[in-house]
């Protein structure tokens, strides 16, 4: 009887939000892979990719999908040497910082010396890194590779810094899906973007102006990475409401550096 009443109340609340207030409302009970807590996932906007948040930690679906993939593919992740480029302050980045013993965070400050520490972050350009060969077990990039001007060089550099058996695990919005990847912007001599199509910007944790979108990737990113590095690539699509993972552009890519292509 109690369950029936709860179901009725939940339905009435949802109807109220959607019909009376004209507001989308979605709530799901589950477990968050990022804060590792039983929680509710709530969205008040139909664009779940940016609005379906964990009530405890505020993580988003792509962050939960990334962390769940790390846990599923590398169960010993907390003892691995991990490099994350351009981390955020929530979601998988927060958990890795708290529990991964050998975790380093980097940002790219264009006007500062590479390899130096700035505001607690090591300054690294993904296209030209100062790390030694075969340094890391995992390299993590979350919605970063759509902002790189020379992704081929960045993928090669990430491959170089990975140990044999290591992997680059990344989220990137595959907006072109089955269509071919498009270069969206080139870099002007002064470092500003030269957009080839409509200007497109995303948020940047260290720059209020944001980051220009330089590529609209499709599923052919898998072949692009393999061609650049020889890595074995898989694209994972997770749709699991228990973990609060449901949204558009939710794919996670795992590019593994095998001993044969070291």
Locations of the language-model features?
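Short cysteine-rich clusters marking metal-coordination/redox-active sites
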Residues: 32-35, 54-57
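Cys/His-rich microdomains that often coordinate metals
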Residues: 38-39, 61, 89
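Membrane-proximal basic amphipathic "stem/tether" segments
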Residues: 1-29
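S-adenosyl-L-methionine-dependent methyltransferase catalytic module, highlighting the catalytic core
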Residues: 18-27, 149-262
């Amino acid at each position: 009887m109690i369950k029936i009443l709860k179901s009725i109340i939940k339905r009435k609340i949802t109807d109220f939000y959607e019909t009376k207030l004209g507001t989308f409302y979605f709530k799901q009970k589950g477990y968050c892979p990022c804060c590792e807590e039983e929680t509710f996932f709530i969205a008040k906007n139909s664009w779940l990719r940016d609005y379906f948040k964990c009530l405890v930690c505020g993580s988003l679906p792509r962050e939960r999908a990334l962390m769940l993939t790390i846990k599923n593919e590398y169960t010993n992740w907390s003892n691995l040497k991990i490099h994350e480029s351009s981390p955020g302050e929530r979601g998988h980045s927060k958990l890795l910082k708290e529990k991964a013993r050998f975790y380093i965070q980097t940002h790219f400050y264009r006007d500062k010396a590479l390899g130096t520490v700035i505001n607690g972050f090591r300054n690294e350009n993904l296209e030209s890194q100062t790390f030694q060969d075969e340094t890391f077990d995992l390299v993590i990039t979350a919605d970063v590779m759509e902002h790189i001007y020379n992704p081929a060089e960045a993928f090669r550099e990430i491959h170089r810094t990975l140990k044999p058996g290591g992997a680059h695990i990344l989220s990137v919005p595959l907006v072109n899906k089955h269509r071919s990847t498009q270069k969206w912007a080139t870099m002007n001599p002064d470092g500003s973007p030269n957009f080839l199509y409509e200007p497109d910007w995303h948020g940047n944790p260290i720059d209020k102006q944001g980051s220009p979108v330089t590529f609209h990737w499709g599923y052919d990113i898998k072949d692009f990475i393999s061609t650049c590095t020889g890595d074995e690539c898989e694209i994972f699509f997770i749709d699991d409401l228990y973990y609060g993972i449901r949204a558009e552009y939710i794919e996670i890519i795992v590019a593994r550096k095998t001993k044969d292509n070291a």
